[in-house]
Amino acid sequence: MSREVLPNNVTPLHYDITLEPNFRAFTFEGSLKIDLQINDHSINSVQINYLEIDFHSARIEGVNAIEVNKNENQQKATLVFPNGTFENLGPSAKLEIIFSGILNDQMAGFYRAKYTDKVTGETKYMATTQMEATDARRAFPCFDEPNLKATFAVTLVSESFLTHLSNMDVRNETIKEGKKYTTFNTTPKMSTYLVAFIVADLRYVESNNFRIPVRVYSTPGDEKFGQFAANLAARTLRFFEDTFNIEYPLPKMDMVAVHEFSAGAMENWGLVTYRVIDLLLDIENSSLDRIQRVAEVIQHELAHQWFGNLVTMDWWEGLWLNEGFATWMSWYSCNKFQPEWKVWEQYVTDNLQRALNLDSLRSSHPIEVPVNNADEINQIFDAISYSKGSSLLRMISKWLGEETFIKGVSQYLNKFKYGNAKTGDLWDALADASGKDVCSVMNIWTKRVGFPVLSVKEHKNKITLTQHRYLSTGDVKEEEDTTIYPILLALKDSTGIDNTLVLNEKSATFELKNEEFFKINGDQSGIFITSYSDERWAKLSKQANLLSVEDRVGLVADAKALSASGYTSTTNFLNLISNWKNEDSFVVWEQIINSLSALKSTWVFEPEDILNALDKFTLDLVLNKLSELGWNIGEDDSFAIQRLKVTLFSAACTSGNEKMQSIAVEMFEEYANGNKQAIPALFKAVVFNTVARLGGENNYEKIFNIYQNPVSSEEKIIALRALGRFEDKELLERTLSYLLDGTVLNQDFYIPMQGIRVHKKGIERLWAWMQEHWDEIAKRLQPGSPVLGGVLTLGLTNFTSFEALEKISAFYSRKVTKGFDQTLAQALDTIRSKAQWVSRDREIVATYLREHEYDQ
């Protein structure tokens, strides 16, 4: 199958777009003038992208189209003109189109977002946009491909009291007969997916700490929560200018909180849009986690102003050049601004593990994956493009050195600014900066699916390393195991890390300086898993003092992954973490708890005595450290100590420790009775979840009331998620009903499922409910949207049996899965992996728990 692209007989140079939304009919009227370069004068038609657009007229240099042939499936319209029309044209011509469209509620194209006015209590709407990947064609007919860059001049028309925003600053604004007409200055050359415009009742705050205006817009009543974002954005823009040695080229930066938004944010050039929760911060009521999340999202989107906007991938298979870079740069800048957050340590337990988890599935895809149409393109906005892409950049930056890496990146941006680039162009720039053959080492990592597991065999003063493709199911076939990954070994011993060693073949032997202590993948910078002998695992578990935080996180994650896939026994993982009860790093503890939670969720349908024993194991692990630290947040507690306390407290509550649960209930009762200082912001999620887990209709009503009247957008989401934790049948049905009756916004459709998925009753009822309402769910949510992807993942991947796998497969075999077939395949692979793990190690885990007396 080949790319579904437009013919190259014309090339767009400039768009003049005028749009007027109608908030009563939920439609919009538009007119369009496109300056075209004529590449072939023998044609008599122009093909253009569109979706859900009505064409009222089309003409080129005064000659009317004689017909408009629309192909909704291909999302293309052919404008047919009289024979000879183009023969009489010069090298360029102006195409004019009058059209109208739907101001939809699908969070795509030019759409409406519903909200409640905080001042008046009225239900209102804002008209906003989400063009990436292929929805600019929903807003106006266009040549909707990333390498067909052009300039854009936008005019918006509406009632006079509404605010108009677009990528550029205002050129002129007039009021005629009660309507406002705003024309914006012409953009630089850019891709259609970055065009943005908003018509809404908005207020703003700004920062003057950058050479251009930096503003944060929100609906009335929320504007005061935008100052953190405005200040951070100004600082970040200045930092990126200095880092890349390239000025931000637009005359302003607007960031807007949008009430219904399918992703987290969108990097539209000069007009970045966000979910409310990912932009606005009530500092007094926000957790440290939320503050860090907002900072990362803002810095990710602002990095895109260079990576993606200034230099754009040539086609969507190069999406990682946008998303991988923006992800890496957000962590890089966060680390520069807030070193106490220890973000590069967190990276290993966050982004790297997210990448490995998805890439361990047979249904994963390469970083550079061939995509041909809109349905395929929308499905690659996943952990491969974002997390594996950024993990690859982290690996390269460690190999080349950060300073050299940034130098090469700056060269890449300068060479291709206002244009398009391919992955090879990046390798060339990094090679020029470093003098190393970057392409030969890195090319395979982007072109091939998966990653290796490295098996270590020890000899006298030597190790033999052998690589195979890693699959979480542990059943890699010979034909799937042909890739030889160039592995940067980063061999660590007591003298440091040797970054010169590379495994370029299936198997090779290396000298050891120190047999007593060594670790492959020092500081966990590589994208692979390491499998040691049981004896080496036992040694490493007692050598924590010789290992960095990243090393310890990596060992925990690797041990769990090797257990899940059958490379080692699950007891190996349990023994490792049992030796680390005195661990001081919150990052390592978070990985321990995450990995243990993965084990528990795989065992969720096992007998109660086994689940209780796993809870006792968890409590044995965490209670001593929790007792040593205490759970109260002190005024002098660092970011790291606060995170550690809440991680341990949460594990204790989740595993049934009655003392910690009673503390959580006390805090909640005080909070619900009006003492808003009763729960530290960082503890709010665990407190709400604990109360919900303990159940009761009275508590349900209290949490539901908090959901309807939250003190912050973060609290609203915490409450909504907690509603899913109630196991009572009637309360569970009530929560599910909110997803379809308008109580829960479509953007938050999956949030209650995050709570429902953690208990057996919820898992089974959620799947039954999804089957009952699938047609409505599929109609309500866009096929390729992150929201539907979340629903599938949360609704399906908690099953752990081959029987469930067969039933789910059979159900979807009768459904149209276009637009989410890849997500579905990944969900089924996840179930298969869990089923194999639990069937293989069921008795081994039971024996371990019995022998260590956790079954008492």
Swiss-Prot record:
Further facts: Present with 77000 molecules/cell in log phase SD medium.
EC number: 3.4.11.-
Cofactor list: Zn(2+)
Any Pfam family matching the protein: Peptidase_M1
A GO term from the CC aspect: membrane
Site (Transition state stabilizer): 386
Keywords on record: Aminopeptidase, Hydrolase, Metal-binding, Metalloprotease, Protease, Zinc
Protein's recorded name: Alanine/arginine aminopeptidase
GO molecular function: aminopeptidase activity; metalloaminopeptidase activity; peptide binding; zinc ion binding
CDD domains, per the entry: M1_APN-Q_like (cd09601)
Cofactor binding notes: Binds 1 zinc ion per subunit.
Active-site positions on this chain: 301
Enzyme class: hydrolase
